[in-house]
């Protein structure tokens, strides 16, 4: 039995999809455990670039089971479209399994997300407007609709009708906009349910059977630790738990069966949407990193905010997620910068903070304390081992590991799979 969790250590977009795809070669089962189609990951397979939002990146390997776990919220329309996209590109999806306990995103969730963000104006959270938060709200309020319900038309119709009594009043009275027809939703979305029914299973059984049989299971996190609803920069967070602890809840696998947690990080920091960002760069260096690193959201297309590497953030991620291994990505993007900076701690009213504060008011007044390191000019995009890196690049990587307290397992020097390099194995 061997299991590995891949989590983002920052605010998402760290390159988890590529690392998951890379580690998928050794895995026999790949599972997602939280989030929905608000997550976007780009995978290069057989020379082709694919963008996925719901389906695990292991789908390209016919011999690997891919699981959408119970902790996810699924937009059936988006899922059917993503399946069609894969089929159009000749990808066999018969290895997909969808949890019958996962909750469903319906049109009223998406509309609620949009009108509420618009209502907040300047105080908006910066959601992807995909209905993720409202779906998780219904789940917590115990009025959510699950995949198992979607497949039973009478049950589905009764639940939608009951929920819309409240939702339509909310739309019409509070938001002063049109509500929805229960009949139209049921007809459209039951049809989507019919198209995905063959993939639906009790995925907790699938995953535990695989682990008990000694198979290698890879759990693929979405977003990042700093977007975790409990451990992130609340309220500028997602509505689920991307941390490794979310695996046990979102997949139905007990904590004793988790062995390695790979924390994925860029060699700098990015963030999409609103919220605090202590090391943000609003200058030419930030613009350069954004351009060279192609820092635009897979899901939203929005320019990502860019900043220096923040070891306070990644140490926080290590602690709350039990990270055992570091995957450091996009080192090549820093090539050509004369001086590099790493945030080692924060200064708050004369006090040095080594740990990430919970209060956003405190965080807003924190100034990053930087350590400066010399940059490098050499092209590193073809490097295969740490020893091949220029001395300054190697020193930078080593310092990141020292400041975060996480040993290096993987590093990448470019966007392609061939530019991802393993330092030590994670699967037994």
Swiss-Prot record:
GO terms for biological process: 'de novo' AMP biosynthetic process; IMP metabolic process. GTP binds at residues 12-18, 40-42, 304, 330-332, 412-414. Its cofactor is Mg(2+). Mg(2+) binds at residues 13, 40. Homodimer. The gene is purA. Its EC number is 6.3.4.4. Belongs to the adenylosuccinate synthetase family. Gene3D superfamilies: Adenylosuccinate Synthetase, subunit A, domain 1 (3.40.440.10), Adenylosuccinate Synthetase, subunit A, domain 2 (1.10.300.10), Adenylosuccinate Synthetase, subunit A, domain 3 (3.90.170.10). NCBIfam families: PRK01117.1, purA. It is an enzyme of class 6 (ligase). It comes from the Bacteria. Plays an important role in the de novo pathway of purine nucleotide biosynthesis. Catalyzes the first committed step in the biosynthesis of AMP from IMP. The active site is at 13 (proton acceptor), 41 (proton donor). Keywords: Cytoplasm, GTP-binding, Ligase, Magnesium, Metal-binding, Nucleotide-binding, Purine biosynthesis. This is Adenylosuccinate synthetase. The keyword Acyltransferase does not apply. The lineage of its organism: Bacteria, Bacillati, Bacillota, Bacilli, Bacillales. Binds 1 Mg(2+) ion per subunit. SMART domains: Adenylsucc_synt. Substrate binds at residues 298-304. Pathway: Purine metabolism; AMP biosynthesis via de novo pathway; AMP from IMP: step 1/2. It catalyses: IMP + L-aspartate + GTP = N(6)-(1,2-dicarboxyethyl)-AMP + GDP + phosphate + 2 H(+). IMP binds at residues 13-16, 38-41, 128, 142, 223, 238, 302. GO terms for cellular component: cytoplasm.
